[in-house]
Amino acid sequence: QRQMCIRDSHQVATMTLIQAANFIKEQFDIPKTSEEIFNDFQNMVIEEYRNTIPLKPYARELVKWMKRDGYKVAVATANEIHLSEMVLERTGLMADVDTIVSCTMAGASKESPAVYELACANMRITPVECVIFEDSLRAMYTAKKAGFVTVAVYDDVAKDSWEEICRITDEQVVLE
């Protein structure tokens, strides 16, 4: 049983699973290979995404409204695409998403704008035509610095960063 400081947990939140496995192995000197840690993560995560992970409050309504009004919808995730697909399929939103991109596909974590830029390229739009909805402080810094319009979506995981998130984003929403 080991604990991670808030700063590190926010950093891990923007990483791919293999990056997180490497980070955790180094930070906690775990006597497993990074691949074994990754596989442990993967198995736990798959089970959660397949059966449990809920949508954020009102996410379904927002996506449906956006599609109805002719907007394109992308999912840009630090997770692997198949995990996002599990949630989208289970919640009935898969058909409403125009593209799903991952940090792995973009070759960088959300500390780089590459994943957002890839989503834009797939939808044939520019960053100024795109609004990023995010809940991670580091991802918000990245998106804002790259010229995207940003909307912070409150998440209890980032509650300690909420004040800073609000300071740097264009808009904020707290949905319950």
Regions found by a protein language model. Give the residues of each.
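Conserved donor sugar-nucleotide recognition element shared by glycan-biosynthetic enzymes
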Residues: 17, 55, 112
